């Protein structure tokens, strides 16, 4: 189960 890239938004 990979983390959603869309939810991995940099600051």
From Swiss-Prot:
Broad class of the protein's primary localization:
secreted
The UniProt GO MF terms for this protein read:
peptidase inhibitor activity; toxin activity
Would the keyword Secreted turn up in this protein's UniProt record? yes
* Protein localization: Secreted
Give GO terms for biological process.
regulation of blood pressure
- Please describe the organ and tissue distribution of this protein's expression: Expressed by the venom gland.
Q: Identify residues that carry Pyrrolidone carboxylic acid.
A: 1
Keyword vocabulary terms for this entry: Hypotensive agent, Metalloenzyme inhibitor, Metalloprotease inhibitor, Protease inhibitor, Pyrrolidone carboxylic acid, Secreted, Toxin
Choose one Gene Ontology CC annotation of this protein and give it. Answer: extracellular region
User: Which family would the database say this protein is a member of?
Assistant: Belongs to the bradykinin-potentiating peptide family.
Function in brief: This peptide both inhibits the activity of the angiotensin-converting enzyme (ACE) and enhances the action of bradykinin by inhibiting the peptidases that inactivate it. It acts as an indirect hypotensive agent.
What is the protein's name according to its record?
Bradykinin-potentiating peptide 11
Q: Which organism is it from?
A: Bothrops alternatus
């Amino acid at each position: 189960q990979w983390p959603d890239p869309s939810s991995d938004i940099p600051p």
